[in-house]
């Protein structure tokens, strides 16, 4: 499937973006392990999150959907054993499902095989295999790739683990496994990554301590069912923040967006660049800070992003590159090598497609150099999404300032995180 898009005069309106993908995954997982009935309100019904829901249904958890909410009858920390010797779980394109679920399955007394689509089957899994194996799980893989064959044990061994990367998926897998350990499990990372798991574990009654980049989780006897409301996803809002900033005369309000301080790197750096962004109606919902984001067209200046900021905006970097093409001066992004092992090699994907659009951009092993110019319009052409939802949405926003017509190949992949993206985009274009 491909879509044809054209330059717009300006964007305006009041919109909401889909619920947070990261929080939805975690809410489904912990609700499934809790005792009692949990409600996950305003969950994200995307392809990725549906994989997590189906995985737990397959393992005997009763999950009903009604009017945009999930009603989860928790099975407790011990999931039902498979009737035919092992579970076969298909994770689709979802790295979150695969890695976080691995931590839970490591503490179950049965065998599970996890497979995925072609893209997921190329993504590195050693980062979770190694620590979970140290805790006592028996995990086999295809040379560090899917399929994973996980034979869990209970209890697992406590672990003191220091990661050389700041990745919330690895951290969460270890913390979830720590629920089933025989003692305290501690995780240390170079820079604090998104902390949705820590916040939610605490909400479900888990004894967890956070001290800077250290997190310690203690074994759990049970999780307590919760009523959770999932806020809008800042990573989805980022595309419309970009649209309002780079299309002249634009003024856009995005309501009910989660602005967790471990996810607000994009907003911080954009304000440093001169962006007119206001966070209004700040409040807290289900342990997460939420607000309405008001964005107006702004003349921007270039900025530098390094490894200390990347974990707080890793998913937003592709669309940040687009913004940087419209910021006066040279923007440098480093410390973002993790982009090479996402749904596509996002460093290569972004660089190759923005060169097609006429941008002055060079790739680095761990980032980009962008020579931006606020007076420069991109040139529409045929571009590839590489079946990567964030690349497709970035290119769609780029089309708003591209002369002529932009055709995006494999445009349907946006459904991974943002069903209805093109409809929302069409509604704000004037």
UniProtKB/Swiss-Prot annotation:
3-phosphoshikimate binds at residues 21-22, 26, 167, 169, 315, 342. Keywords: Amino-acid biosynthesis, Aromatic amino acid biosynthesis, Cytoplasm, Transferase. It catalyses: 3-phosphoshikimate + phosphoenolpyruvate = 5-O-(1-carboxyvinyl)-3-phosphoshikimate + phosphate. GO terms for biological process: amino acid biosynthetic process; aromatic amino acid family biosynthetic process; chorismate biosynthetic process. GO terms for cellular component: cytoplasm. The active site is at residue 315. The keyword Transferase applies. Pathway: Metabolic intermediate biosynthesis; chorismate biosynthesis; chorismate from D-erythrose 4-phosphate and phosphoenolpyruvate: step 6/7. It holds the Pfam family EPSP_synthase. Its main location: cytoplasm. GO terms for molecular function: 3-phosphoshikimate 1-carboxyvinyltransferase activity. Its EC number is 2.5.1.19. It is found in: Cytoplasm. It is an enzyme of class 2 (transferase). InterPro entries: Enolpyruvate_Tfrase_dom, Enolpyruvate_Tfrase_sf, EPSP_synthase, EPSP_synthase_CS, RNA3'P_cycl/enolpyr_Trfase_a/b. Phosphoenolpyruvate binds at residues 21, 95, 123, 169, 346, 390. Catalyzes the transfer of the enolpyruvyl moiety of phosphoenolpyruvate (PEP) to the 5-hydroxyl of shikimate-3-phosphate (S3P) to produce enolpyruvyl shikimate-3-phosphate and inorganic phosphate. Monomer. Belongs to the EPSP synthase family. This is 3-phosphoshikimate 1-carboxyvinyltransferase. It comes from Endomicrobium trichonymphae. The lineage of its organism: Bacteria, Pseudomonadati, Elusimicrobiota, Endomicrobiia, Endomicrobiales.
């Amino acid at each position: 499937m491909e879509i044809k898009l054209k330059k717009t005069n300006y964007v305006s309106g009041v919109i909401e973006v889909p619920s947070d993908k990261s929080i939805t995954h975690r809410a489904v997982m912990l609700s499934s392990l809790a005792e009692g009935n949990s409600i996950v309100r305003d969950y994200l019904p995307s392809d990725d999150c549906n994989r997590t829901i189906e995985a737990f249904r397959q393992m005997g958890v009763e999950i009903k959907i009604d009017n945009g909410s999930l009603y989860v009858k928790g099975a407790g920390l011990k999931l039902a054993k498979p009737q035919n010797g092992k579970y076969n779980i298909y994770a689709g394109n979802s790295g979150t499902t695969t890695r976080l679920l691995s931590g839970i399955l490591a503490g179950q007394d049965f065998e599970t095989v996890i497979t995925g689509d072609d893209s997921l089957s190329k993504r590195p899994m050693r980062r979770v295999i190694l620590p979970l194996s140290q805790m006592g799980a028996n995990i086999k893989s295809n040379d560090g790739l899917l399929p994973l064959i996980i034979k869990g044990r209970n209890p697992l061994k406590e672990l003191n683990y220091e990661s050389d990367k700041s990745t919330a998926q690895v951290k969460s897998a270890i913390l979830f496994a720590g629920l089933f350990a025989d003692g305290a499990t501690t995780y240390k990372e170079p820079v604090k990554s998104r902390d949705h798991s820590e916040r939610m574990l605490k909400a479900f009654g888990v004894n967890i301590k956070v001290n800077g980049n250290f997190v310690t989780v203690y074994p759990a006897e049970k999780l307590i069912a919760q009523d959770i409301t999932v806020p809008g996803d800042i990573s989805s809002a980022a595309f419309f923040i970009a649209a309002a900033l780079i299309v002249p005369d634009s003024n856009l309000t995005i309501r009910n967006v989660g602005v967790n301080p471990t996810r607000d790197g994009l907003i911080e750096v954009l304000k440093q660049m001169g962006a007119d962004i206001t966070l209004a109606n700040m409040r807290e919902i289900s342990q997460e800070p939420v607000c309405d984001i008001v964005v107006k067209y702004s003349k921007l200046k270039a900025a530098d992003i390094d490894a200390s900021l990347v974990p707080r905006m890793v998913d937003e970097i592709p669309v940040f590159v687009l913004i940087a093409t419209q910021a006066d001066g040279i923007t440098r992004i480093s410390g973002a090598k993790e982009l090479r092992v996402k749904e596509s090699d996002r460093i290569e994907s972004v660089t190759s497609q923005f060169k097609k659009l006429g941008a002055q951009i060079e790739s680095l092993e761990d980032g980009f150099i962008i020579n931006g110019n606020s007076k420069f319009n991109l040139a529409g052409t045929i571009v590839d999404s590489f079946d990567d939802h964030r690349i497709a949405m970035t290119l769609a926003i780029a089309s708003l300032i591209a002369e002529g017509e932009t055709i995006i190949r494999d445009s349907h992949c946006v459904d991974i995180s943002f069903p209805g993206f093109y409809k929302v985009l069409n509604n704000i274009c004037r």
